[in-house]
Regions:
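N-terminal membrane topogenic signal
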Residues: 2-23
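Aromatic-anchored segments of alpha-helical transmembrane domains
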Residues: 26-35, 79-85, 172-180, 297-308
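Short, hydrophobic transmembrane alpha-helix segments
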Residues: 31-44, 58-67
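Structural signal for the C-terminal ends of transmembrane alpha-helices
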Residues: 55-65, 151-158, 283-287, 329-334
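Membrane-interfacial catalytic/cofactor-binding modules of polytopic membrane enzymes
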Residues: 181-285
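Membrane-embedded catalytic cores of phosphoryl/pyrophosphoryl-handling enzymes
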Residues: 244-344
Length: 344
């Protein structure tokens, strides 16, 4: 009977391998079908579900690794829940929303000009050019790339994965705390509201939900003095319109729906900018040198996208970069302290 044990073990491994391949194939079919019928998984909760179920399928037959998926990926869930709850946190705390400070800061930085207004005056066309496809995709990568990086690291090196999770969760939670105590309106909202509309610092005045067309003097943001032929002569929120060239109207509708349901006054700091530079900095020494220009370009294109499409002020982006640098430095110091403490 003993000589048969290896054969039995080998047969069991073959069965588990077949089961794993079938599970992965089924996962691929489900994801492709849902993508084709309902659009890309821009909803972060759904994306996290896709990743976790895919990792579970790929872990069949590998001991306790399936359980590790649930244990290891739990830290991401509180971040998503906290972000959803942050919408009303500032109201509960009683903090007024900042409407004027970022506009004034950008004007001071750029000698009286507001970069969002300046860029839309000179670049916005009546119909989205090809490069708006690029910036729409770069903007949406914020909701996808960190989770994909985490999934790859989890499969390749769990120590690296743990280091990345510390950066992701740490940066996200600090930003969420700041959103609760310092709510701030983005440029697209400032273009829709006048000083009278936002007396007292409301978080969700009615002016935020109307078009910027016809708002006196361009609202708090200031009026566009010129525009390209045929383009609207007011500042618009245009981050998703690039997908119109690809007929991805479902994706645009999903993003618009998602934008309407999240915290609309979470502008300072820009988590888009902060997390982008944090991911780039984390990968900088972990990728071949030839990829580093792409990481740097990614950070800069994201910054341009956020300003041009009226998602963030420049000062929001600078503060996002600063927060990322502080979090990375604190984590590095903490890890160095742990290593020294372990050797002691």
């Amino acid at each position: 009977m003993l000589p048969r044990a290896p054969e039995a073990g080998s047969a069991r491994e073959r069965r588990l391998t077949i089961a794993r391949r079938i599970a992965v194939a089924a996962w691929v079919v489900v994801v492709v079908y849902r993508t084709a019928t309902t659009g890309f998984a821009f909803n972060r909760e759904l994306l996290l579900l896709y990743i976790c179920t895919g990792l579970i399928a790929a872990s069949i037959g590998q001991g306790r690794r399936m359980l590790y998926v649930i244990r290891d990926w739990l830290p991401f869930a509180p971040v998503l829940v906290a972000y959803d709850f942050s919408r009303g946190a500032a109201t509960l705390i009683g903090r007024p929303t900042m409407w004027h400070w970022q506009v004034d800061a950008d004007r001071w930085l750029f000698f009286g000009n507001v970069p969002t207004v300046w860029l839309q005056e000179r670049l916005k066309l009546p119909h989205p050019p090809w490069w708006e496809i690029v910036i729409s995709s770069v903007y949406m990568s914020f909701f996808i790339l960190p989770y994909v990086v985490a999934a790859v690291l989890w499969l390749r090196d769990r120590n690296e994965w743990k280091a990345f999770v510390r950066v992701f969760v740490g940066l996200s939670f600090v930003a969420l705390v700041i959103y609760a105590i310092l709510p701030a309106a983005p440029p697209w909202a400032a273009a829709r509201c006048t000083a009278r509309d936002v007396v007292g610092g409301p978080a969700g005045p009615a002016c935020m939900f109307r078009p910027a067309r016809g708002v006196p003097d361009g609202g708090l943001l200031g009026a566009m003095q010129t525009s390209r032929d045929g383009a609207n002569n007011w500042v618009e929120r245009i981050v998703t319109r690039g997908w119109g060239n690809l007929n991805l109207h479902t994706a645009s509708a999903l993003v618009d729906q998602g934008q309407a349901s999240v915290n609309l006054v979470a502008a300072i700091p820009s988590l888009h900018a902060g997390l982008t530079v944090a991911v780039a900095a984390f990968l900088w020494t972990r990728v071949a040198r030839k990829w580093r220009p792409f990481l740097a370009s990614y950070v800069l294109i994201m910054a341009f996208t956020l300003v041009y499409t009226a998602e963030h002020f420049v000062v929001d982006i600078l503060l996002g970069w600063l927060l990322a640098a502080v979090v990375l430095l604190v984590i590095r110091c903490f890890e160095s302290w742990r290593r020294r403490d372990g050797r002691a």
